[in-house]
Amino acid sequence: MTRFRSLALLAACVAAPAFAQMQKGLPPPAATPSTASSRFAREAANGGMSEVELGRLAVERATNPAVKAFGQRMVDDHSKANVELQAIASQAGIALPGQVDAKEKQTYTRLAALSGAAFDRAYTDDMVKDHKADIALFEKASRASGDSAIKNFAADKLPTLREHLKMAEEAQASLGK
């Protein structure tokens, strides 16, 4: 019995390197995205989808031309960024949400109930606050993400987000007090 175990052990030791060599032709398993990268991608996707929905609402409801133009810019820029993020997330094995979360739905519902100057004011106030938070989120991801594609995406979008903040502040200022 001891001799049988010894032979079985020897056979396993000899076969293991041969089996390992056969496996070299297979692609390595996909790296699991870090929790921070996944969280960033999901938050960015949620925010991006919300920006598009709210931008469309602004195009329909805004009475101030600067607010209306800002809304259209949000639709254009965030639609493009959402497509880019989806491709990066898919490559990294990160599942993104298909719709905005409950908080963003509440924001939409609240703004959709407004019209005229009240809508313009509330929308621009939200966009200023939201873009400040977006910039902080993207700055953190551009420095600390463990996934280089996510890190580069965040860094590449920062100038656009800063421009959006400036535009939102200008639209807000055009409304007066």
Spans of features found by a protein language model:
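His/Met- and acidic-residue-enriched segments that coordinate or traffic transition-metal cofactors
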Residues: 2-7, 18-177
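Repetitive helical segments and hydrophobic/amphipathic motifs
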Residues: 12-14
